[in-house]
């Protein structure tokens, strides 16, 4: 099983080929290929490579499928014994990326 742990926009993701992941918004066009080069760990069928902090020999190639928005999160604040209430919603901008290849040199 080939997988990699990649850092994207400050978060770490366990990535496998052929699957898609919802990441924070990446400002690029649809159907464009991207290269993820901040690879922290790679597993090539039992051979584990660990970066310090990143692996220069491993590149992850993906394709942007769509831009979407996440589920709505409700933020509700109130002060007890007062008439102060504040209800606010938030939807995160996301980008769906299909991982096509994990290339290990």
Swiss-Prot record:
The UniProt entry, under SUPFAM superfamilies, shows: L21p-like
Q: Which GO terms describe its biological process?
A: translation
Question: Any idea which UniProt keywords this protein has?
Answer: Chloroplast, Plastid, Ribonucleoprotein, Ribosomal protein, RNA-binding, rRNA-binding
Give the domain of life.
Eukaryota
Predominant cellular place of this UniProt entry's protein:
plastid
Q: Which GO terms describe its molecular function?
A: rRNA binding; structural constituent of ribosome
Give its localization. Plastid, Chloroplast
Question: What GO terms fall under cellular component here?
Answer: chloroplast; mitochondrial large ribosomal subunit
Q: Which InterPro entries match?
A: bL21-like, bL21-like_sf, Ribosomal_bL21, Ribosomal_bL21_CS
How would you summarize the oligomeric state and partners of this protein? Part of the 50S ribosomal subunit.
* PANTHER family per record: 50S RIBOSOMAL PROTEIN L21 (PTHR21349), LARGE RIBOSOMAL SUBUNIT PROTEIN BL21C (PTHR21349:SF7)
- Family membership noted in the UniProt record: Belongs to the bacterial ribosomal protein bL21 family.
List the NCBIfam families: L21
Instruction: Describe its function.
Output: This protein binds to 23S rRNA.
Record's protein name? Large ribosomal subunit protein bL21c
Originating species: Thalassiosira pseudonana (Marine diatom)
């Amino acid at each position: 099983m080939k997988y990699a742990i990649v850092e994207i926009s400050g978060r770490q993701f366990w990535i496998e080929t052929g699957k898609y992941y919802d990441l924070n918004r990446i400002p690029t066009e649809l159907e464009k290929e991207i290269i993820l080069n901040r690879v922290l760990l790679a597993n090539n069928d039992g051979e584990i490579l660990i970066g310090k902090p990143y692996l220069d020999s491993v590149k992850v190639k993906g394709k942007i499928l769509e831009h979407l928005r996440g589920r709505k999160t409700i933020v509700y604040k109130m002060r007890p014994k007062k008439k102060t209430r504040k209800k606010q919603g938030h939807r995160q901008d996301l980008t769906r990326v299909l991982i096509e290849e994990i290339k290990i040199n």
